[in-house]
Amino acid sequence: MSCVHNNTSFPVQIEAYLKEVYEKYKELQESKDTSLTARFARALKYYQFLIYTAFSDPKFGIGQGENTRGLLIYHQMGMGKTILSLSLAISLSHIYNPILIAPKSLHSNFQQSLLKLIKLLYPETTDHSKELQKISRRFRFVSLDAYNMGQQIIKAGGSLNGCLLIVDEAHNLFRGIINSANDKTNARQLYNNIMQAKNIRILFLTGTPCSKDPFEMVPCFNMLSGRILLPLHYERFYTAYVNKTTNSPLNADKLLNRLVGMISYAGNQNELNKLFPTELPLIIEKVEMSPEQYRQYLLARDVENAEKHASSGMYEKINAAALCLPGSEQESGSSYYVRSRMISIFASEMLTVKEDEKLSEAVQQLPKEAFTENSSPKIVRMLKNIKTSPGPVLIYSQFVELGLHVVARFLEIEGYQCLQPLKVLEEGHNTILLHKDGKDLMVKNFAEDGPTHTLVLSSKITRFTLITGKILSKERDMIQQVWNSPLNIHGEVIKILLVSKTGAEGLDLKYGRQVHILEPYWDKAREDQVKARIIRIGSHDALPPEEKTVQPFLYIAVANQKMFYSIPEGSQEQKTIDERFHERGLEKSHLNSAFRDLLKRAAIECAFNGESGCLMCQPTNALLFHENFERDLRLPNPCQPLVKAEVKAYSISYEGKQFFYQKNKDVGLGYTFYEYNPIIKAYIEIKPSNPLYIKLIKHVQAGTTA
């Protein structure tokens, strides 16, 4: 079977194909077959096996010949995107050179997932290290965040020709491309290399596509198709596909036609949702700033407003460039409002930074008296909420020095102890074990041929630790192993984990009961990504049913009311930056969510999963879209909805084939004929324009009805 995605027959063909694959999956699950395909069927979830088969089947079409080059793997966070991609890399490594692109901090995640997959594939083997080394040698890792990423790609394989490219956290790549003002950035260079590559297969892994702006779809699907499938300029894309008045998709049917065959989605199925803990409704804590904090906040806003006016007009050139967001979008990024947002978390007159002194060091040198409710009402409110948690707690802030490090000082003052992994970690020692020795906990780090290093943790002390972008991967791995230990089920070893944006990526945590987001962000998908670190498939299986819940909190700084009303009318900012970011995020989230719904409707599994609104066309074998998007918008939609219904009809046999017909006065010649389509396993109407139609009428009228 071969399918081409630019064809009205593709949706019904893929539905029928996946049904066959699912039946095969169920058979292999129960079999004792030792073939690699059977092993993968037993190792993978059904939704993973569907994509594994469709992508690796040389007869099917995804990524084959002139068809699409790969898939956007849009699977809900915690559903095993890494395992799926590694499965395909193993199966296709004899044909394609696997290159894994991810932030450097996530490279060890792939190694851990690879070991997990090998154990699932070969449960009869006790020593998996040799197989791990053998398979690992086929892979090449490239750091998307490295300054020399281009050189790493050359070292990995010379070029991207003939490679299987796996990009983890792919939304970061899409954002990097549209945030680039020129072609010199890592992200833009990678885009150009992918567009020029020959015989390339691609897997983009993300749980949050279209998180910043629908325009992220442009580089994504251009790379997957290998051509300019979507318009490169922001305004042309918005004119074609975004209704700015209603803040919703425009010409959605035409956009769906272009995207079908390039998306895999898994996440809404009821049987899968049962495997996740329950996410309780978000608690939004609006925290009034203290008078001194608000005074410093207003001074910071004056500086930011002056900088904004000084730079006005500088983005006009950027607006006209291809693959670039307008300047107003760049303005909303991390380089603006940083002062006021950090002061919204913590403000102290005692904080001064000496020459050649790091901000984190200055925070560490502050006396205990600097950490009060007056300097940070937000953190004090958060600590009160944390004390109600029956289990481990995750805290997120975009800001490290004046966010996480300040929280750490508050925790230390409250009597918490910081767990420092480097006290136990040694080079070559990559196995972590926890066990109880009386009332104390022992963390052991050892290698098979080396000494064991032990860290004794008193059960009387409550601990916290941090994961930021600067932490070593071995420290990150140890923290994750200790957190996920059965001995930490209620936070006995690590009660609180503080993470930054970079630190949070790729974490797979168990048992978490609360998530605290210290400041809002105008990209609500980031909040979802943070929550997904502990809301994962099977993450709470060890807990009783009543404890399988996660409570998220979001903290928003609001104006000090007494000072606000003392400011002359007209000079007041009606909303704080926190409030503006939160409201902007909700507005953008509405539009982005609508486009993510379109991605779900275009997913190759949509009809198989029984979702509503799936793109399903009558299989007329016509082109689904015109290559020129502007002309495509003017043409009639070739996708005529496929409607399945039971009808009463008569059977006839013509030239050895069976057909059915109805007498129908509403049709010009008085008959409707149907023929069997083996691909969709259903009867479809024969159009009057088909030469067979007239032959069948003559056959019926000749009185040869069976």
From Swiss-Prot:
It comes from the Viruses. Its EC number is 3.6.4.-. InterPro entries: Helicase_ATP-bd, Helicase_C-like, P-loop_NTPase, SNF2-like_sf, SNF2_N. The keyword ATP-binding applies. The lineage of its organism: Viruses, Varidnaviria, Bamfordvirae, Nucleocytoviricota, Pokkesviricetes. Residues 62-227 form the Helicase ATP-binding domain. ATP binds at residues 75-82. Part of the viral DNA-directed RNA polymerase that consists of 8 polII-like subunits (RPB1, RPB2, RPB3, RPB5, RPB6, RPB7, RPB9, RPB10), a capping enzyme and a termination factor. Its main location: virion. Pfam families: Helicase_C (PF00271), SNF2-rel_dom (PF00176). One of its GO terms (molecular function) is RNA helicase activity. Putative DNA-dependent ATPase required for providing the needed energy to achieve the termination of early transcripts. Belongs to the DEAD box helicase family. DEAH subfamily. One of its GO terms (biological process) is DNA repair. It is found in: Virion. The keyword Hydrolase applies. Residues 378-599 form the Helicase C-terminal domain. Disulfide bonds: none annotated. PANTHER family: DNA ANNEALING HELICASE AND ENDONUCLEASE ZRANB3 FAMILY MEMBER, SWI_SNF-RELATED MATRIX-ASSOCIATED ACTIN-DEPENDENT REGULATOR OF CHROMATIN SUBFAMILY A-LIKE PROTEIN 1. A motif (DEAH box) lies at residues 168-171. Keywords: ATP-binding, Helicase, Hydrolase, Late protein, Nucleotide-binding, Transcription, Transcription regulation, Transcription termination, Virion. This is Termination factor NPH-I homolog. One of its GO terms (cellular component) is virion component.
